[in-house]
């Protein structure tokens, strides 16, 4: 029997930089100083050619809040994990 569990993960990120693994189509919430500034569904992750180590996040809607891009953010997202039993 398979079941899906939602696991809350916290990933430190700067200027929307984040590891690309397993985030496409997931809803993520971006927090700064304890305030939710944007929560949306991630539709694409890209690594610019001029900066291979930098990951860009693209959402299905633009964030409506003003974000201090010089700060360090924590991105919290619900990742689905499957367990077989």
Which residues fall in each region the model found?
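Short beta-strand-centered aromatic/proline hotspots
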Residues: 38-46
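Basic/aromatic-rich interaction segments and small domains that mediate binding to polyanionic partners
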Residues: 45-65
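Structured surface patches comprising rigid loops and adjacent beta-strands/short helices at the edges
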Residues: 67-81
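Short coil-to-beta-strand transition motifs
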Residues: 31-39
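Short acidic, Gly/Pro-enriched loop/turn segments at secondary-structure junctions
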Residues: 51-52, 78-85
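Mixed-charge, Lys/Arg-rich low-complexity intrinsically disordered regions
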Residues: 2-21
């Amino acid at each position: 029997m398979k079941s899906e569990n939602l696991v809350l993960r916290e990933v430190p990120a700067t200027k929307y930089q984040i590891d690309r693994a397993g985030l496409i189509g997931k809803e993520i919430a971006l927090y700064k100083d304890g305030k939710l500034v944007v929560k949306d569904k991630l539709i694409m992750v890209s690594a610019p050619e001029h900066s291979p180590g930098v990951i860009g996040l693209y959402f299905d809607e633009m964030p409506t809040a003003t974000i201090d891009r010089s700060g360090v953010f924590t991105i919290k997202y619900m990742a689905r994990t499957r367990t077989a039993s």
